[in-house]
């Protein structure tokens, strides 16, 4: 089950049922099944608090993924700062909705085992994001 909640922000005008079906399809293409995935859409202050408290990082970010997956069943809590998504969209000169979909997919891709921290991993993640967006 995939759920979306908000904290300190309004829910974006997105078709949640379509997004959920899309994320399930993305998982299946990577040989995974969806367990409990909770998205919390929040503001910069909340994501900074989470980043400090749980990861000991003192900076803003667009997404934090806590992975509780087991074998081929993906599960986790995914925090997304809508403030950072908006500023990234402006900086990258892409639409807000497009950037939000990219970040939403990014979280599921992390749960599917794709990382973006090591050498060459960022390119792998970007390719996976692009493939996921094609499915949408």
What is the role of each PLM region?
Residues 1-101, 112-136:
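An acidic/histidine-cluster motif and surrounding catalytic segment
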